[in-house]
């Protein structure tokens, strides 16, 4: 598994996939990433973080869960790297349930600016509930944007519509400085890919949005070089 990538295109940065202590939510119907966990993830993470050079001053960290689920040794090493490599911007991912802990978490890495992305997946509350995302139906895009600067959107599962995909993109553009569009790839879960929907997106939507600097499009899980 590749866990380090240097991204030169949109939002140039170093991108690392660390191992967490286990996703605390672990209920999303489409996700099996939570299997990437161990009781001593620092053994994996130390080798990954030692590859960070600080080339762009931006470090993006994901861990198949939420940043708050990283072990303490790993968090301390990230703090050291921020200082040693002069990292001025850090990105982390977190579930919405951690929203009120983000500010305190960010203080650990001062003076770096810390930004967070949330795996919202969709703003369609019925679909979000079906996917068991754990974000209440009453939560609005404005609510999410109070805590998170970026989001991840998922598309291409059976039962979605073209209108739903376009609406999600429209909302994300309005409220967030960054978002990724992730095509669903069949995995070990019960969710199944809608190949025709992804083909439509690739042919008709992708050409219109591919140059937007705020949007990263992943047609495969490994398109950013990790996984």
Can you describe what each PLM-predicted range is?
Residues 70-79, 99-109, 162-165:
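Distinct, well-ordered alpha-helical segments
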Residues 2-44:
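Canonical Radical SAM [4Fe-4S] cluster-binding loop centered on the CxxxCxxC motif
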Residues 47-52, 104-107:
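Short amphipathic alpha-helix with an adjacent loop that forms part of the alpha/beta core around
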Residues 137-193, 201-224:
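Conserved C-terminal portion of the radical SAM core fold
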Residues 196:
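A conserved mid-domain beta-alpha-beta active-site/ligand-binding segment of alpha/beta enzyme cores
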Residues 3-7, 27-30, 214, 218-227:
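N-terminal pre-core extensions flanking Radical SAM catalytic domains
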Residues 33-47, 55-72, 82-100, 113-138, ...:
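Core AdoMet radical
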Residues 83-86, 107-111, 145-146, 173-175:
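Short, conserved loop/helix-junction motifs that constitute active-site signature segments
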């Amino acid at each position: 598994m590749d866990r380090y990538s240097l991204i030169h295109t949109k939002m140039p940065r170093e991108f690392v996939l660390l191992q967490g202590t286990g996703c605390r939510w672990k209920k999303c119907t489409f996700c099996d990433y939570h299997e990437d966990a161990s009781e001593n993830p620092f053994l994996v993470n130390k080798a990954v973080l030692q590859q960070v050079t600080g080339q762009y001053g931006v470090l993006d960290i994901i861990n198949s869960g939420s940043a708050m689920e990283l072990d303490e040794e790993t968090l301390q090493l990230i703090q050291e790297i921020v200082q040693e490599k002069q990292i001025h911007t850090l990105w982390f991912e977190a579930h919405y349930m951690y929203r009120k802990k983000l500010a305190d978490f960010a203080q650990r890495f001062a003076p770096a600016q810390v930004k967070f992305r949330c795996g919202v997946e969709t703003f369609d509350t019925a679909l979000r509930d079906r996917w068991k995302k754990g974000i209440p139906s009453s939560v609005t895009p404005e609510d999410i944007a109070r805590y998170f600067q970026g989001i991840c959107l998922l598309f291409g599962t059976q039962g979605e519509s073209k209108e739903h995909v376009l609406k999600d993109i429209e909302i994300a553009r309005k409220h967030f400085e960054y978002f990724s569009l992730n095509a669903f790839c069949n995995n070990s879960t019960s969710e199944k890919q809608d190949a025709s929907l992804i083909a439509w997106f690739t042919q008709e939507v992708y050409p219109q949005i591919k140059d937007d600097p705020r949007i990263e499009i992943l047609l495969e899980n490994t398109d950013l070089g990790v996984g």
